[in-house]
Amino acid sequence: MIRRILVGLFSLIAVGIAFAASPPNEPILIKTTRLIDMSKGSIANDQAILINGATVVEIGPSSVVSQHAAGNVRVVDLTGLTVLPGLIDCHAHVLGNLKDLSAVAQLRISSAQATLWGVHNLQIWLDHGFTTLRDAGEQDLGYGQLALRDSIKMGLIEGPRMVSAGNFISVTGGHGDADALAVDQALPPRPNLADTVDGVAAAVRHDIKYGADWIKLMATGGISDPMSDFNVQELSEEQMSRAVEVAHRAHKLVMAHAEGQDGIKSAVRAGVDSIEHGTLLDEEGAALMEKKGTWLVPTLSVMQRYATIGRESGLDPVALEKSRLILKYQSDAFQRAIKHHLRIAFGLDDDPDYLPNEFAAMVKGGLTPTEALQTATTHAAELLGLSSEIGSLEQGKAADIIAVSGDPTTDIHAMETVVFVMKAGKILRDTRAKEK
């Protein structure tokens, strides 16, 4: 497998360098039957998009935009398909073999191997139409996720544009502690483990030093490790407040993994920018998030999937049992989030092969299909501070464009068939050619 990934990496580097050296130099005119206006939540029929370089320069009725296109324009006919903006995943973990869910999976491979796996994984996000993602933190001493982010930005490899957290900041023995080994086999202390207020501040500064865009705090225990309790608050409110203070002073944002009620509320009071999961969200917590404008990234489908898989996945039996226990709280918590009009952004927190599952889970949980799509477009762009660049198809924004068969505003399962992907004006996927 590693050999195949290496071969793929070298191919991607060659392609990436070619892309970097030869950006699109002819205007592109995309024609489509249906275009979803994510800002309005409506569909416009018989539309066209004129693209120059990496940017949308005009969008509107096909009969009008086509007249404005220059003579040498390249026409991409997406008639019969639905066009929408490139999608955004706000809770990704890109490093390593994402099908190995064991507690020591990352300890069995080097940082270099984990990063090579990341190159492979990023192609799957693109396959599903995700042209931007936020890595929600890793356990990699080499910060491979930041190397991938920068390599994509430089055009060395192909992948979604990335913003990224550093490594999970956790208490010793908490959900972000990579050491699941026996006491007499313990790992040396890692810089992301912090048991004091000053220790948390130092861990934040360590991540910032090496280029993190976001800081990831483990406010509570979690599911996938065999040690922590998802009900238990781990980092104290004082620790999280200090982390937010240090991060915000450096113009970095903060996300908090928070499953249990106490940890959710402490993280919100501490001033974090987004709550990840929020699985046991109660009325008090939802009202507090609404008042403070804190984002929620609910990651619904991953727990639903974990509750159905067995030990062949690598998950520890303790983690499997926790996933089944926590699932009973999920639906009520999501309903509270909707009732309190919380700002919700799309996040998978799983193997990207399962990306369409999250759309279906949010619709099953109470969002309309259009609202679910907005979590991965306009809402996600707002959370990441990128609304002026991505999230909707408008003049002056990035030409991140995807097309799907069917109409996902009436049947969210249409998101399972992404057939065309463009990022920054470059066509990266077009399976229509295979169908002809």
Which ranges hold each PLM region?
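Bacterial N-terminal signal peptides
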Residues: 5-17
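His/Asp/Glu-enriched, well-ordered alpha-helical/loop segment
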Residues: 249, 253, 317-408
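Histidine/acidic-residue-rich catalytic or RNA/ligand-binding cores of hydrolases
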Residues: 98-99, 145, 174, 225-227, ...
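Active-site gating loops and adjacent loop-to-helix segments of metal-dependent hydrolytic enzymes
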Residues: 96-114, 172-188, 223-237, 292-328
